[in-house]
A protein has these predicted regions:
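Pocket-edge structural micro-motifs
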Residues: 9, 25, 32
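Intrinsically disordered, low-complexity boundary segments flanking structured domains
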Residues: 6-10, 55, 101
């Protein structure tokens, strides 16, 4: 029997220390609000197995600068990176077809998004 691993909530060992989060192989999803307001997170390295990022998963991660999605992320939820004010660049595979409502709203440092498969950008996706 195969299991799906989804990160539901992230709690750092040292709340005041900046960390580089590495999700282990086998994780297929980051749940809604899993990293919400976790200012400790500086970067995220996701496994090939990741296919879904939930609503507001990284909302308010003000120190998040870099996100690495090496696999085939097909769904990124609403407000997933909202208010990630330090996020500068993010790259997705061709499997992502839609940038949902307010995905990067308030991500004021964002200057580059590579998403070659996107055919739909919903409202407020990049609103400053």
């Amino acid at each position: 029997m195969a299991y799906e691993i989804i990160v539901a909530k992230f709690t750092p060992d040292e709340p005041d220390e900046r960390i580089d989060a590495v999700l282990p192989d086998g994780v297929v999803g980051v749940g809604a609000k899993a990293f919400r307001f976790k200012g400790e997170v500086r970067s995220l390295c996701a496994p090939q197995s990741l296919i879904e990022v939930g609503d507001a998963a990284f909302d308010g991660c003000r120190n998040l600068v870099q996100v690495d999605f090496p696999g085939d992320v097909a769904m990124v939820g609403k407000r997933a990176f909202q208010h990630c004010t330090s996020l500068r660049e993010i790259t997705f595979a061709e499997t992502l077809g839609c940038i949902d409502d307010a995905t990067f709203q308030g991500a004021t440092s964002l200057s580059r998004v590579v998403a070659p498969g996107v055919t739909e950008i919903n409202r407020y996706a990049f609103q400053r």
